[in-house]
Amino acid sequence: MSGSIRRSYTAMQNFPRFLLGVLFVATLSSCRPRLSEDEANWKGQTETSEVEEHLLLDPGNALRLFCDTNQSSSINWYREQERLLSGGKIRMVGTVLEVSDVTYEDSGLYICVVRGTGKILRRFSISVVDSLASGDEEEEEEDDDDEDGRREDTTADINEEPVYFFQAPYWTQPSRMDKKLHAVPAGNTVKFRCPAGGSPLPTIRWSLKNGREFRGEHRIGGIQIRHQHWSLVMESVVPSDRGNYTCVVENRVGSLTYTYFLDVLERSSHRPILQAGLPANTTARVGSDVEFYCKVYSDAQPHIQWLKHIEVNGSHFGPDDFPYVQVLKTADINPSDVEVLHLRNITMEDAGEYTCLAGNSIGLSHQSAWLTVLPNEDFLEQAEPAESRYMDIIIYTSGFLAVAMAIMIVILCRMQTPHSKQTLQTPTVHKLAKFPLIRQFSLESSSSGKSSAPLIRITRLSSSCAPMLPGVMEVELPLDAKWEFPRDRLVLGKPLGEGCFGQVVRAEGYGIEKDRPEKPVTVAVKMLKDNGTDKDLSDLISEMELMKVIGKHKNIINLLGVCTQEGPLFVIVEYASKGNLREFLRARRPPTPEDAFDITKVPEELLSFKDLVSCAYQVARGMEYLESKRCIHRDLAARNVLVAEDNVMKIADFGLARGVHDIDYYKKTSNGRLPVKWMAPEALFDRVYTHQSDIWSFGVLTWEIFTLGGSPYPVIPYEELFKLLREGHRMDKPSNCTHELYMLMRECWHAVPTQRPTFKQLEHLDRILTAVSEEYLDLSMPFEQYSPSCEDSASTCSSSDDSVFAPDPVPSSPCVFNYHNIHSQLGT
């Protein structure tokens, strides 16, 4: 009895475990898809003639499929031979399958099968068009049209030709693939397409001529593979992109291949070409409408302006021999809009010369036409009575004014006579305003740069203390023994140039080299003229002190000494015998074909690609040194880089430079004129200068080097330049510049300052320098197209804009020096 009770008790204890095991097995059975009986049955029917129904959906849409059946038995749903279960975004109610928020992965073959028998009731081929990436939003309109056509064609094919469960890939639009050879200019965007179909939906990949898969890292600039468009897109193609491109379309049944050949054509290195005879001379009457036409042909992006020649102060030309003009119409994004100039309801004032001016990164072209305006006869009849009526009034008024002016002249002459005599008896005095100039540099220096005492002691120097050169302002400065050079050991020679308020004189210095005191060394001496202001004097002294603090480097103009005692202020610097870099490059351009046999126009030396890379590398080294000294240059350009013997580059013109110690940026608050074509956007719009803004200027300088002294942004007015820079436009690649170097320029012109390289990184140009030979690039082609159609201003003032037409005479801006002798120019 007790044993029976014990067995019953044990059974009761094990019953919950038994029940839990049964439930667990049942749960697993219900969760696991039934792939045995019905799946085996319908898999045997995959080659039947049941017709698929095709549906094309956009991502995010809902898929709803009905399995029509009169049978009472339940059904199962499969996608690509995998059974579907309710859950997540899949919902099955009776014979209806619902899939919410479909994606590209939901594409494939859907079938409904009678549970137990495996009989296939319906087949659905679902294609979900993958969403466009953000970079695809700029798809051309014709591509969109092509895609619409593809969808329509696909639909037509589906209606006319049934597609079965398994089908090898096939071309859906073979007529669009007839063009196997694609020849495009460099810089264009290329698109290859291989639209295909098949069941299941095939995949596409692209391979190069060696058979390996083509990926984005295989090409500078990357690629875009658009699976939903069956396309390969490459932007800004270069000659190295030439070759075969093969698309491979495949699914589980088979595969297809198709090969395209890409040929990239070099762009034409030529300034814009204007159609002969346009614009044409026109004659019209007052009140009529006139149109001038100008047809422009240019491979590079042209910039077009319509100009009207005007008269200013009785002259049509300014002091620089440039005509005075008024800009009537400007366009650069859509040149066709500006190829026609419309003049409505013209008057007599509209008569004159009109010019169509077109420019690109290579150079400028222009053609002019005259408009003759004839008066209307009615207008003449009405004007004659008015003229006779007012003639008497004009005569009497003119006579009265002439007498009054004569009396005024006599009175003024009598008043000026005593004053003039008194002035002749008074000795001339050069006056200096009483202002203390405190040093602004806190860098470590053994010179007097640590002193905070005023640098200028106000004195009056009469004309009896005659300076060494006439018209030179004198000032007394404290003695700095480290830099002071004896004035009597300096023999001044001929002037090298003069600028806004100063001049530079070539000189021989005895004792510049300490170990050879009797050997003369050729130097350049800077000094003020008598029309220099207190601000000019302050700038020159500040520059002198900055050069003391910066120290010496091979690739900058170095300070050799100063003369501050017993005479005018002299700043002695190194002499660069080959002038500034811009004129150095222009003088060494290969001759044009028409000048090839003119010995006088053949340059003394030609530059190789290696020489040009060396120029950029040396400037980068000099700027890296200035950056290490916390100096922001602010006016880095080819005109401010000098060339010494052995083609050594020396950065000059510290007139705009600023030394900074506690912060690495400088914000300008004055409204002086600035070198806008070399300035970074943050410097243009926010007046904030950093080492990164100098990097932007270095990119423009590199562009100048590889165009052999070309003018950046030709013809573009400042207002238009601001807009283009904001929109992300940049200058084209020079024709004799490699893609690698152009990509370096583009990195220097990055809109985000922190994304630009540093000068330390730019010093890696030496890698390119050692990798190329002297004959790497042939520079024997004519470079005259890089010059503007007139000579650029030789001024080193920051206001130089390299325009071919001056809209108005502009006074020189206050810069340190502005040399007219540009061949032997020495900048500060």
From Swiss-Prot:
Compartment annotation: Cell membrane; Endosome; Endoplasmic reticulum
Residue ranges of every copy of the Protein kinase domain listed in the record: 490-777
Compositional bias per record (Acidic residues), positions renumbered to this chain: 135-147
Signal peptide: 1-31
Gene3D superfamilies listed in its UniProt record: Immunoglobulins, Phosphorylase Kinase, domain 1, Transferase(Phosphotransferase) domain 1
EC number(s) given by UniProt: 2.7.10.1
Glycosylation sites: 70, 244, 281, 313, 345
InterPro entries found in the cross-reference section: FGF_rcpt_fam, Ig-like_dom, Ig-like_dom_sf, Ig-like_fold, Ig_I-set, Ig_sub, Ig_sub2, Kinase-like_dom_sf
Binding of ATP, residues: 496-504, 526
Enzyme active site: 635 (proton acceptor)
SUPFAM superfamilies: Immunoglobulin (SSF48726), Protein kinase-like (PK-like) (SSF56112)
TM annotation in the entry: 393-413
Domain Ig-like C2-type: 33-127, 169-259, 272-372
Entries under PROSITE patterns matching the protein: IG_LIKE, PROTEIN_KINASE_ATP, PROTEIN_KINASE_DOM, PROTEIN_KINASE_TYR
Ways its activity is controlled: Present in an inactive conformation in the absence of bound ligand. Ligand binding leads to dimerization and activation by autophosphorylation on tyrosine residues.
Modifications made to the protein after synthesis: Ubiquitinated. Subject to proteasomal degradation when not fully glycosylated. Autophosphorylated. Binding of FGF family members together with heparan sulfate proteoglycan or heparin promotes receptor dimerization and autophosphorylation on tyrosine residues. Autophosphorylation occurs in trans between the two FGFR molecules present in the dimer.
A cellular-component GO term for this protein: endosome
GO molecular-function term, one example from the UniProt record: fibroblast growth factor binding
Modified residues (Phosphotyrosine): 665-666, 776
Purpose of the protein: Tyrosine-protein kinase that acts as a cell-surface receptor for fibroblast growth factors and plays a role in the regulation of cell proliferation, differentiation and migration, and in regulation of lipid metabolism, bile acid biosynthesis, glucose uptake, vitamin D metabolism and phosphate homeostasis. Required for normal down-regulation of the expression of CYP7A1, the rate-limiting enzyme in bile acid synthesis, in response to FGF19. Phosphorylates PLCG1 and FRS2. Ligand binding leads to the activation of several signaling cascades.
Family: Belongs to the protein kinase superfamily. Tyr protein kinase family. Fibroblast growth factor receptor subfamily.
Protein name listed in UniProt: Fibroblast growth factor receptor 4
Organism expressing this protein natively: Xenopus laevis (African clawed frog)
The encoding gene: fgfr4
